[in-house]
Every structure is written in C-alpha cells, then in structure tokens.
Amino acid sequence: MAHKKGVGSSKNGRDSNPKYLGVKKFGGEAVVAGNILVRQRGTKFKPGANVGMGRDHTLFALVDGKVVFTNRGAKGRFISVEAAAPQVAAD
C-alpha cells in the first residue's frame, strides 16, 4: 500500500505569446517608405504596386504615399501604395 498520495500532472497550463498580427495601416492613410502595412500568416493580403513582402509575409511600403486596398476577386486582396507627388522646393 502506498503511503504517499499520487500527484497527477497536467498536460495543459501553458500559453503562447501574442503575435500582434493584422492590418497596421488602413486605406487612405499616409505612409512613408518602410512602414509596415500588414503583419500576417500566409498571404491573406498580397503586395500590389509599391509594396514589398518580407519572408514572414509582412507587407511594407516601398515609397511614401497613400495606402489603397483593392479586391481582385479570385486573385485575392491586394494592398498598394499610391506614390505621393514629389515635393519641389520653391527657389
């Protein structure tokens, strides 16, 4: 007969850190080159004009401008950046 009480172990009791995914810059917002537009797993959104994609599928602006979302049906949802007109210094 055992004189110690058997102590069970739990297979639960852990949690992962939050990943902070999602859209970071919405349609119409002004962005500068390098701004992160979307953090995602897989290609929920695809890069359009003036948008690059990192190796973790993060979309980021390649130029200064305004964010534009477009839905191309079966091809998917695309994010583009409309380049801002270059500022010309007045002499």
Curated annotation (Swiss-Prot):
Keywords: Ribonucleoprotein, Ribosomal protein. The keyword Ribosomal protein applies. Belongs to the bacterial ribosomal protein bL27 family. InterPro entries: Ribosomal_bL27 (IPR001684), Ribosomal_bL27_CS (IPR018261). Residues 1-20 are annotated as: Disordered. This is Large ribosomal subunit protein bL27. SUPFAM superfamilies: Ribosomal L27 protein-like (SSF110324). NCBIfam families: L27. GO terms for cellular component: cytosolic large ribosomal subunit. GO terms for molecular function: structural constituent of ribosome. One of its GO terms (biological process) is translation. Pfam families: Ribosomal_L27.
